[in-house]
């Protein structure tokens, strides 16, 4: 049975619910009021962002290997899109027939010849390889001077192409994923940490469909906390590596409609993870998921923060999505919770990763409005307003920021 009884709410919690699908223009006006924007702010932001972008581009241009390759094949180009589609898809396809079809679809249309210039060996080698691959899976051009060579290579067929592409894409994937396991990721982080970088680790995976799934994910999180805790070596939640937990992975019925089960079954599991994190003095973040799960995640956060056994632990973390129209009210609530608990809460501000599904779900459900901003620059504006709120509070939250946007 579903528990649809309304829970008593504080004024701040009520504001979160009331602004679930608030009119977008009203939200923007509120954000502008929070920001109190002026031309001096804009000038300074442009200067800092321009310097950051130029430094990153210079490093990419001077870089070797995959960095140079990604700089060459931009995501706005047909070739860049083809490479990213392969990187996203090829590793997930188990059968060779479908892999061949994917190669045919994504590679044969690219203008790889236009990228065979410059002095970067990796880019040129990749371009020539992709050029030949594109010809191999397309119709032969008898007028081409390279037709004979292509037909010769064609004798080997798509298995050679498939294996070569698989190797190349796996190599590219290693540039973006720290490791296939937490231990491999920790090993890969040793050198960057010596340069001053800090890491927060995510356990990639889907939501649990059964309790058996949840128990398996739970064991993975426990092992990960042990590994990260040992690597942390007493540096504390603020100065060492941390980890994020996806609540839908440790309980198959993580929803407001199942609140009683969430509190009686999921919370003890979550509490166990946080107590373990406290032993190692590492940060553990409750990761953000779909918008309809926000209230129940805040209920769990409040119960954790007010738990006597977790008193004084400054590694309790919560992720807030700036693309939600009620994000500023969530920040107000978390700050108030930290004050009530007399304990600092770690807050990580992100843009949000479920935009497509949030828009589609609202449309399918016939909602009058959306829970997220419909325009990217509105989300950017929300991010800045939320960041200002977070940085304006001393002693109650530890602010962390995640963004790919130099202006943010």
Where are these regions (language model features)?
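Positively charged, amphipathic and often flexible ligand-engagement surfaces
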Residues: 1-408
């Amino acid at each position: 049975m579903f528990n649809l009884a309304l829970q008593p709410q504080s004024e701040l919690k009520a504001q979160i619910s009331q602004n679930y699908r608030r009119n977008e223009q009203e939200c923007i006006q509120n954000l502008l009021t929070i920001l109190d924007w002026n031309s001096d702010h804009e000038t300074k932001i442009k200067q800092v962002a321009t310097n950051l972008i130029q430094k990153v581009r210079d490093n990419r241009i001077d870089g070797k290997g995959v960095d140079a390759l990604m700089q060459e094949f931009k995501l706005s180009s047909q070739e860049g899109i083809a490479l990213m589609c392969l990187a996203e898809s090829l590793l997930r396809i188990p059968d060779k027939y479908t892999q061949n079809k994917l190669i045919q679809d994504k590679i044969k249309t690219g203008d790889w010849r236009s990228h065979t210039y410059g002095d970067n060996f990796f880019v040129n080698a990749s371009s020539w390889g992709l050029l030949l691959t594109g010809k191999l899976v397309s119709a032969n051009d008898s007028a081409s001077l390279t037709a004979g060579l292509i037909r010769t290579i064609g004798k080997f067929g798509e298995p050679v192409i498939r294996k070569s592409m698989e190797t190349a894409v796996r190599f590219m994937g290693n540039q973006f994923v720290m490791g296939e396991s937490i231990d491999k990721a920790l090993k890969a982080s040793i050198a960057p940490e010596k340069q001053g970088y800090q890491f927060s680790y995510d356990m990639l995976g889907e939501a649990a469909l059964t309790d058996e799934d949840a128990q398996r994910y739970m064991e993975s999180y426990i092992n990960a906390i042990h590994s990260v805790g040992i690597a942390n070596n007493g540096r504390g939640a603020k100065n060492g590596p941390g980890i994020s937990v996806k609540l839908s992975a440790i309980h198959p019925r993580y929803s407001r409609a199942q609140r009683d089960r969430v509190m009686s079954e999921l919370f003890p599991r979550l509490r166990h993870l946080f107590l373990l994190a406290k032993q190692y003095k590492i940060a553990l973040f409750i990761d953000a998921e779909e918008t309809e799960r926000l209230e129940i995640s805040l209920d769990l956060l409040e119960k954790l923060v007010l738990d006597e056994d977790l008193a004084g632990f400054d590694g309790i973390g919560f992720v807030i999505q700036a693309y939600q129209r009620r994000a500023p009210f969530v920040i107000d609530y978390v700050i108030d919770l930290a004050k009530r608990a007399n304990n600092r809460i770690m807050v990580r501000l992100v843009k949000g990763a479920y935009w497509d599904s949030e828009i589609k779900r609202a449309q399918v459900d016939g909602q009058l409005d959306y829970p997220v901003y419909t325009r990217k620059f509105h989300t950017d504006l929300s991010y800045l307003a939320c960041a200002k709120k977070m940085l304006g509070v001393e002693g109650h939250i530890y602010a962390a920021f995640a963004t790919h946007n130099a202006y943010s």
